[in-house]
Structures are given as C-alpha cells and as structure tokens.
Amino acid sequence: DDLSRGLGDVYKRQNLISFFNIKLMFKKNFYALVCGLLFSLGFAPFDLWVVSILVITCLLFLAEGLKSRDLFYLGYWFGFGMWMTGISWLYVSIHYHGNVNIIGSSFLIIIFVSILSIYSALTFLLYSSLKNYDSKMGMYFALPSAWVIIEIIRSHLFTGFPWLISGTMIGESLIDGFTPIIGAQGNTFFIILLASIIYKIVDCVNKKIYPLPQFAFLILLICFSNLAKQIEWTYQAGEIDVSLHQPNLTLEEKWSQFGIVKTQAMIYNSIEEAQIGELVVFPETALVISENDNLDFMNEIKLLSTQKNLTLVTGIVERENN
C-alpha cells in the first residue's frame, strides 16, 4: 500500500510538472508569435529596425533552456507572426485583384504562412545545434549563422521566396556602412549579431556580472559600421537614360485581347520615343502572351531596339515543352 501510494504521488507530480511545462511552452510560443508580429516593423514603410533587433533579443531570452524540439516550435510561431504581417499585401492581391472571397483569401494566406513558418522553425533548430557545438562562441554567432543559412536556402529552394530578407531593413540607416561589402545577407548576420550581443549584455547584468567586453564589442561594431558609411565604396562610371513604364491596366484588362494590344502599343511607342542607348523598363509580367505566340511583334521590337542600341527589360509569360 505504501509503495502504491508512493508511486501514485510520483505519477501525480510528473503530471503536474508536465502540465506546468506545457503551460510554460504555450506562453513562450504566444510571446514568440507576438515577437514575430513586431519584427516586421523593421521593414518599410515603418523602418523601425531598432525594434526588430530588440525583438530578436527578447526571442533569445524565450529560447533559454529549451530543447531542440521546443526551439523548433518557438521558431515556428515566431515565423507565423512575422509572415502574417510581412506578406499582408498578398491578401490584398488575392482578395481585391484576384476576386477571391474573404474566406478563400484568408485560407490561402494561412496555408502559405504555415509553410513559410517552417523556415523560421528550422532556423532555431539549426541554432540549437550550432550553439551546442561551441558554447563560448555559439552564444554570439550561432543564431546569426543559422538565420543567414536558412534565409539563403529560402531564397533559392523551390524557385525561392526572397521576401523579408532581414538585412534589408537597415538600408540607408546609421549602421548600414558594411552593406557595399557584405550585402543584404551580410547585414542579416550583422543585425542578428547585434541582438545576440545585447542579449548577452542584459544576461550579464541580470547575473550581476559587469558586461564590459560585450558592451565594447557592441560599440565597436556600431562605430565601425558608421565609419564605413562615410567611405565612397563605388564611383560613377557614367550615366544612362532610363524610362520606366507602367501600363496601369486592371487584372481583367491585362489578360484581355484589349490589354495585350495596348501593352504592345506602349512598348513599341516607348522604344520609338527612347533616346539612343536608353534603358526601357516595363516592370513585372507586362506581356501575358508567350514569345512563340507573338513572334512577329517580338522580332519587330528586337530589330527596333538593336537599331537604337537600347535595352528593353520586361517580364513575359513563357511556355516550355509545349
């Protein structure tokens, strides 16, 4: 009887511990979702990149002491929040321009966001492995490395979705001095590194440890980045005339015979009116008819462009293997 009661007490305690662990993870995942919603404020038009850096710092505190599986879920819910706010324009495109009802549009967005969030989950899963590989350096470089690796994979896998590249948020800011050298992906590493250093500074303060090395590292990075901004990394090699054209057609008009004819006329007229050597740009998929189905027009504008030594840049619907 005593043994049975003892085992029963142990079982109850285990259930109680499991309950509190589940409750704690639920709270952490909810906070991660909120962090994801706030992270997108770093991108245009808000440009609150400082908020985004602090959000990652908060996320690192949420990640403290978590196992790989829990980090996967934490990253997933962070990604869910980030993508829900970061690609809200897709809902506008699907609902208002694609004429899909509210329920259908919302369903498509949720499915898309759910898939994209896996990338953020993988980021934190990789972070867990890198952090354990080298505990001293991992606290600073594990998350930046994991973030950049997964961003690069996301930009290329399955034709890629290079949207919300974190490093782009500090463009034209006080700390974008390294951009000409390291590019957007390098900037991603840079801002996540800043967040990691801030996390370590706060952690040291909480443990009553003076964070002089971390604070000095942070100040040096910011100062060097600002100094690099003063350097002219490029020089002007010449000038080129550019004309940018937007057909301004509704979706229905664009895919109609009327829209095709109007777009072709605009392209032809823009080439005729362009200066010699000019760059003529029609953004996105201006021509919604394949080259094989439109050979006469394509050959005509190619000839005209060659005669005027100009370049035409546009998108076109293409079909392969019939």
Give, region by region, the residue ranges found by the protein language model:
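Intrinsically disordered, low-complexity serine/threonine-rich segments
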Residues: 7-9, 18-23
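Soluble catalytic regions of membrane-associated enzymes that act on cell-envelope
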Residues: 228-322
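Membrane-embedded alpha-helical bundles of multi-pass enzymes
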Residues: 20-230
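Single conserved hydrophobic/aromatic residue that forms the stacking wall/gate
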Residues: 1-14
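Active-site phosphate/pyrophosphate- and oxyanion-stabilizing loops and adjacent acidic/basic residues
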Residues: 1, 176, 302
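Intrinsic disorder/low-complexity segments
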Residues: 12-13, 18, 278
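Active-site flanking residues adjacent to catalytic metal/cofactor-binding acidic residues
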Residues: 1, 150, 283
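A generic fold-level signal
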Residues: 2-5, 45, 158, 237, ...
